[in-house]
């Protein structure tokens, strides 16, 4: 899960169905976990 440490700072993808969907508020797309 990309929303969990230590990966959350590296998640940038907002595309549903992908391994990196739904990320932290730190990413450039503004996604949230």
Curated annotation (Swiss-Prot):
One annotated Gene Ontology cellular component of this protein: extracellular region
Subcellular location: Secreted
Entry's Gene Ontology BP terms: defense response to bacterium; defense response to fungus; killing of cells of another organism
Keyword vocabulary terms for this entry: Antibiotic, Antimicrobial, Fungicide, Secreted
Major localisation: secreted
Chain segments annotated as coiled-coil in the UniProt record: none
Function: Has antifungal activity against N.crassa and F.culmorum.
Name of this chain's protein: Mytimycin
Annotated organism of origin: Mytilus edulis (Blue mussel)
């Amino acid at each position: 899960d990309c929303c969990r440490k230590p990966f959350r700072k590296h998640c940038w993808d907002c595309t549903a169905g992908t391994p990196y969907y739904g990320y932290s508020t730190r990413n450039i797309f503004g996604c949230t976990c």
